[in-house]
């Protein structure tokens, strides 16, 4: 705990993961907390040793994995209108908006978090910056463009949701979040994106990153529908001190790759 110089907080609808890093960017510890009710969140923040002992002295980034987000081209973005952009895709009552730049400042992702939830985090974590969780997926996938085919779907799995990106001729043409609970959900949403992009299902490539068990999807079922499918792990750029690397067993993007 004494070596902690930075915190990454991965905040899902029913899960909080705390990654503590030292001054060299090495992950020194990971705490994973499932929860059901929001009042449990405050108890988690109170008892976590990394947060309770170091959160007032180090930088912390809260990655919010929620349906409340939208992408805006930088040339059209006005920071004073962030809530307006977000309101096009979700209701913003009782929500605070935030934003961050992506793709060498060509894109801006606007996210939202409940005011009451943000107040809980702010109570226990100083120097808190906010980013939408999908920003990690987009940044990673844009870096993979040179390796992509002319028609490619990329899927990042995060708990009970997926981010699906569609690339045509190595350019991002589609990106959105979907809640997936079974094979039927996955096929429904992926087929919808394929149709929207006019992709040939028999020839386009689909790349999946993450743990299929988190969305209750079976590889053998998907291979009946996708002939060019690859399940992959990112090339590791996230480094660990001995003992902390077990986080990679989650197969999460954040366990392998650091932006």
Question: Language-model features: where?
Answer:
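Hydrophobic/aromatic-enriched cytosolic interaction surfaces used to assemble or bind macromolecules
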Residues: 1-259
């Amino acid at each position: 705990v004494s070596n902690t110089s930075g915190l990454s907080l991965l905040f899902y609808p029913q899960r909080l993961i705390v990654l503590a890093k030292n001054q060299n960017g090495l992950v020194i510890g990971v705490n994973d907390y499932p929860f059901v009710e929001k009042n449990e969140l405050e108890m988690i923040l109170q008892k976590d040793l990394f947060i309770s002992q170091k959160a007032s002295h180090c930088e912390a980034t809260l990655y919010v994995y929620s349906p409340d987000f939208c992408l805006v081209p930088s040339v059209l973005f006005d920071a004073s209108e962030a809530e307006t952009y977000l309101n096009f895709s979700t209701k913003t009552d009782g929500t605070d908006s935030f934003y961050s730049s992506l793709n060498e400042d060509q894109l801006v992702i606007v996210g939202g978090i409940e005011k009451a939830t943000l107040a809980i985090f702010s109570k226990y974590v100083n120097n808190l910056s906010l980013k939408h969780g999908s920003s990690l997926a987009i940044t990673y996938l844009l870096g993979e463009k040179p390796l992509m085919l002319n028609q490619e779907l990329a899927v990042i799995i995060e708990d009970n949701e997926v981010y699906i990106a569609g690339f045509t001729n190595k350019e991002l043409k589609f990106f959105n979040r979907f809640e997936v609970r079974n094979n039927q959900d996955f096929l429904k949403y992926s087929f919808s994106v394929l149709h929207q992009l006019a992709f040939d299902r028999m020839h386009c490539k689909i790349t999946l990153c993450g743990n299929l068990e988190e969305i209750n999807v079976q590889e053998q079922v998907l291979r009946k529908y996708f002939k060019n499918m690859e399940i992959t792990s990112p090339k590791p750029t996230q480094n660990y001190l001995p003992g902390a690397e077990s986080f990679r067993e989650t197969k999460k993007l954040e366990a392998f790759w650091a932006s």
